[in-house]
């Protein structure tokens, strides 16, 4: 019996060690070697077939090709290369000049986009116009259309450029790329709308293939069917920069990772003549000065570049525009790259003349697809747990006879994308059915912002939101600020939608430290802090994406303490408890959050506060702010505005006074050029302001501002004390504004109302 047990134990031990992670059997190793041998045999077979195709060809490009005999198949292969892909347009223009008919187009990355456009019937002029008119800085963001965001998103979430999430299993989830690519995808859908109902790329006016990489296996995938916009998106999704494109539970990235110059694909499709355009850069060299981006680029393109060197030698006509030194992400001067493509192709004009066939060229051009409205009778939704068909129908644009243009479909998709819990959305049309595929934010959404303001210093703000969807949508949020003036707040915002009408309810409780900066003769002489415990209840209505009105009630316990500088400013050394209420209306129709050129921003608020701690202080009043922006031209815009406020009461708490100065507005602070942050305190004030803005680029702006102020204060010893309208103060200055991935950066120089020296201010990020 013991012998049998020993033998059985020995068998199970042998079985375990044969198939465990650490010990692998001889048979397992041999099987793996055989698998690799089979893969190499397939590669050899592929190369042999290419060799046979080349050996069959007897075409001499130095002589006129006879198109009346056996019609040679001409393929155009366009390599990847980012912004340098504009050179492809110049090559196409020269091919059209010589009326060279193209039968096959194969492209990788940007080559797949330019090639795809030509394959559906765009002319080189149309391609150039489309590319030159693209707003690349807008495409290279995750921003949703601000006009479509709800008012709560505009007020709060616009301030957080960084996002991540914690899933339902409490695993921290970082983005798979810097950008989710949604805006690029929507642009591609717009470009390829004329091919919306073409699913087989052999049926396009010119047979077409795009190259992408299966991220799971690292293998090359040749795209011959599907949605053309998705195909080109898969082909150009640069690893780490753009999130991989998910399709049928697989993830795809830039085809340049495996095959940046797919001449072999053209050969496999039976091409007799291959015209290939190479815009690839010289292979980057790793040295001590290399950075993370260089290393990632090297790793992600190693195999693709290795193939490129071989494939170059397989082209019948290799055209190499002089663009190798142009940066792949530099989208300036694209028209110059187009010219370089023309120059490079024109060198071989004598060859292209031999490939000319006006008859075949005309037949090719006559097949060009045109944009047409699409009949949509059915709607399908995939990937949704929260979004409903009812909501999708509510967002549907109004059209006649269910005929949707490309703009209608893109606007519909943008509206779905603008919903706060939607992270990605794509669509395709099959016959009379539109299918929306969505990716929703689930679990805990974490947002972050890094900020800096002159005098205030640096800060990091984080918000974590747990959404709860039902009859009432509830967002439970924790907000925190790490800075010299820390804050933490817990709140719940709930809303119930009735069509476009929304009922809002909120509750919050928090502790915050706010600074009180005190200046005299232009110098900061003291800093006090307000340590505040605050809780509020609110109820409001949003009648559109731009307007919200409501009422709030709350309790506050304020304890002001000295922090630094002059200790003798007793006015701010106070402690009080109060209950307060306010009525408010907020309107926001701005086209941009940071540097708007169009729209209105309006804030009206009436307030009341009553001390309950025995200090017998009370106050009531109101405040307003209104700014209006109008474009004067494509680059120039003008903004005008007014602001003001008045409070009255007994024993007014000095820390409740209006705070004037700095470049940004906040809850009780009003910007004024010519004063630093909190440069003046007032119980009544009025500001008139105006400014000019010039857009140098999509992200860089020149700013000029002027404002006038009159104010009164309650006998504060460190500042002028005049009655309202007794004096008028004038501030003016100029600077730059830069939209960055961290948020806006402002550098501004102005006069200083309290000093003969200029006032220099720097702001980065947002004000909370």
Question: Where are each of the predicted segments found?
Answer:
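Sec-dependent N-terminal signal peptides
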Residues: 5-14
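Outer-membrane beta-barrel and related beta-rich outer-membrane complex signature
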Residues: 289, 517-519, 558-565, 616, ...
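Gram-negative/organellar outer-membrane beta-barrel architecture
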Residues: 407, 426-583, 590, 661-670, ...
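Sec/Tat signal peptide C-region and signal peptidase I cleavage site
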Residues: 16-20
């Amino acid at each position: 019996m013991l012998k049998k047990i020993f033998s059985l134990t020995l068998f199970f031990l042998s079985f375990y060690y044969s198939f465990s992670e650490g010990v692998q059997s001889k048979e397992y190793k041999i099987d793996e070697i055989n698998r690799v041998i089979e893969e190499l045999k397939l590669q050899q077979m592929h190369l042999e077939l290419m060799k046979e195709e080349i050996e069959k060809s007897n075409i001499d490009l130095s002589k006129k090709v006879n198109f009346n005999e056996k019609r040679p198949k001409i393929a155009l292969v366009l390599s990847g290369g980012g912004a340098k892909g504009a050179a492809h347009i110049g090559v196409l223009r020269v091919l059209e000049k010589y009326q060279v008919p193209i039968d096959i187009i194969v492209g990788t990355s940007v080559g797949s986009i330019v090639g795809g456009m030509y394959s559906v019937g765009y002319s080189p002029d149309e391609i150039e116009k489309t590319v030159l008119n693209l707003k690349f800085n807008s495409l290279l963001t995750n921003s949703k259309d601000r006009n479509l965001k709800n008012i709560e998103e505009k007020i709060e979430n616009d301030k957080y450029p960084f996002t991540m999430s914690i899933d339902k299993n409490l695993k921290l989830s970082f983005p798979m790329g810097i950008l989710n690519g949604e805006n690029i995808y929507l642009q591609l859908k717009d470009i390829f709308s004329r091919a919306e109902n073409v699913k087989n790329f052999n049926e396009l006016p010119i047979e077409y293939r795009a190259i992408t990489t299966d991220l799971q296996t690292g293998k090359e995938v040749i795209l011959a069917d599907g949605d053309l916009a998705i195909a080109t998106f898969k082909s150009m999704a640069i690893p780490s920069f753009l999130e991989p494109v998910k399709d049928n539970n697989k993830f795809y990235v830039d085809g340049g990772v495996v095959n940046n110059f797919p001449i072999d694909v053209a050969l496999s499709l039976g091409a007799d003549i291959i015209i290939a355009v190479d815009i690839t850069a010289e292979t980057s060299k790793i040295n001590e000065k290399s950075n993370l981006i260089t290393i990632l680029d090297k790793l992600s393109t190693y195999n693709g570049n290795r193939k490129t060197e071989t494939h170059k030698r397989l082209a019948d006509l290799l055209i190499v525009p002089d663009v190798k030194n142009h940066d792949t992400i530099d989208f300036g001067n694209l028209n110059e790259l187009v010219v370089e493509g023309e120059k490079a192709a024109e060198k071989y004009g004598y060859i292209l003349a031999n490939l000319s066939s006006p008859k075949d060229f005309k037949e090719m051009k006559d097949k060009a697809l045109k944009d047409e409205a699409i009949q949509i009778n059915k709607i399908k939704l995939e990937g949704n747990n929260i979004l409903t068909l009812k909501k999708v129908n509510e967002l549907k644009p109004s059209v006649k006879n269910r005929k949707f243009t490309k703009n209608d479909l893109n606007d519909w998709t943008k509206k779905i994308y603008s919903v706060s819990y939607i992270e990605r959305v794509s669509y395709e049309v099959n016959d009379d059915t539109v299918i929306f595929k969505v990716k929703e934010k689930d679990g805990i959404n974490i947002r972050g912002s890094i900020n800096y303001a002159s005098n205030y210093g640096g800060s990091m703000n984080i918000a974590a939101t747990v959404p709860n969807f039902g009859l009432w949508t509830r967002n439970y949020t924790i907000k925190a600020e790490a800075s010299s003036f820390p804050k933490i707040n817990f709140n719940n915002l709930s809303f119930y939608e009735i069509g476009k009408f929304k009922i809002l309810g909120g509750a919050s409780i928090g502790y915050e430290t706010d600074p009180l900066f005190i200046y005299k003769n232009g110098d900061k002489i003291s800093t006090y802090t307000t340590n505040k415990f605050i809780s509020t209840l609110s109820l409001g209505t949003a009648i559109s994406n731009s307007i919200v009105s409501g009422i709030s009630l709350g309790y506050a316990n304020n304890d002001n303490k000295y922090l630094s500088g002059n200790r003798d400013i007793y006015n701010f050394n106070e402690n009080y408890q109060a209950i307060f209420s306010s009525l408010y209306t907020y309107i926001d129709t701005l086209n941009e959050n940071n540097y708007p050129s169009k729209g209105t921003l309006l804030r009206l608020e009436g307030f009341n506060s009553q001390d309950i701690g025995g200090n017998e202080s009370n106050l009531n009043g109101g405040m307003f702010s209104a700014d209006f922006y109008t474009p004067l031209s494509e680059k120039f815009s003008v903004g005008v505005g007014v602001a003001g406020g008045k409070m009255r009461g007994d024993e007014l708490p000095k820390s409740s006074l209006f705070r004037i100065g700095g470049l940004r507005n906040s809850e009780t602070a009003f910007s004024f050029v010519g004063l630093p942050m909190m440069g003046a305190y007032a119980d009544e004030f009025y500001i008139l302001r105006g400014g000019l803005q010039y857009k140098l680029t999509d992200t860089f702006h020149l700013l000029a501002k002027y404002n006038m102020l009159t104010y009164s204060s309650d006998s504060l010893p460190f500042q002028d004390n005049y009655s309202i309208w007794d004096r008028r103060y004038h501030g003016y200055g100029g600077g730059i504004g830069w939209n960055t991935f961290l948020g806006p950066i402002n550098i501004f120089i102005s006069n200083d109302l309290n000093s003969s020296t200029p006032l220099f201010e720097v702001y980065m990020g947002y004000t909370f």
